[in-house]
Design a protein with these regions (language model features):
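PP2C/PPM-type serine/threonine phosphatase catalytic domain
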Residues: 1-234
Length: 234
């Protein structure tokens, strides 16, 4: 397994509210752990929400005695949701904060994926496939047939999400499991990448046979910034 991770503040924001956690080795009973979180909130609340939620997630996973990856991740996300919501209610400077979160662990030949919000997980191999489903207003409109995927990319409400950690007392988490084929690439990212770079361009960069994993990752960040870098990128 070869891994690249990075965050970038982008071209328009002063603060980076994206947060990434990567462990190729065990975290608790999980053999590895990969997480992207995209925080939201005024002042430094979004930065706090994403980083604190991931810290809670990792701590909970380390303490969990269960071996079922779905149960372990679900419990950890629920704990992070409760903590973020409680902190937002206790501290007026953090009021209204929240964060997206996409989490993955690879067990044998299977990836177990959890998602809240509009951060994404893709699989790239002979094409590109978005595994997660965005919890966003425009995606709901697409599902209902009100707008097309092309219209969704430039819709004025495309940044409005319908689920986030810290938004409600309980959090609704989507889970996916997929069998991984040899040679496939998994990409986890915030909307600062997926809103700035078309899926086809992502596939082109990832599939470049001349580039190594670090060069591909750097190329994705560079492409997002060259296209406007309107948000933080992870």
């Amino acid at each position: 397994m070869r891994i690249y991770s990075a965050t970038d503040v982008g071209q328009k924001r002063k603060m980076n509210q994206d947060y990434v956690f990567v462990s190729e080795g065990p975290v608790g009973n999980l053999p590895n752990l990969f997480t992207v979180a995209d925080g939201m909130g005024g002042h430094n609340a979004g930065d706090y929400a994403s980083s604190h939620a991931v810290r809670i997630l990792v701590d909970e996973i380390r303490e969990d005695a269960d071996y079922n990856p779905v149960k372990v991740i679900r419990h950890a996300i629920e704990a992070a949701n409760t903590e973020i919501r409680n902190r937002a209610q206790e501290d007026e400077n953090l009021r209204g904060m929240g964060t997206t979160m996409v989490v993955a662990t690879i067990v044998d030949q299977y990836a177990y994926v959890a998602n809240v919000g509009d951060s994404r997980l893709y699989v790239i191999q002979d094409g590109i496939r978005q595994v997660t489903r965005d919890h966003s207003l425009v995606q709901e409109m697409v599902r209902m047939g009100e707008i097309s995927e092309a219209e969704a990319r430039n819709h004025p409400d495309k940044n409005i999400i319908t689920r986030a950690l810290g938004a409600e007392k309980t959090v609704d988490v989507d889970f996916f499991d997929l069998k991984l084929e040899k040679g496939c690439t998994i990409l986890m990212c915030s909307d600062g990448l997926s809103n700035m770079v078309e899926d086809e361009k992502i596939q082109e960069i990832i599939s470049d046979p001349e580039a190594d994993i670090d060069q591909k990752g750097s190329a994705l960040l560079r492409e997002a910034n060259q296209n406007g870098g309107k948000d933080n990128i992870a």
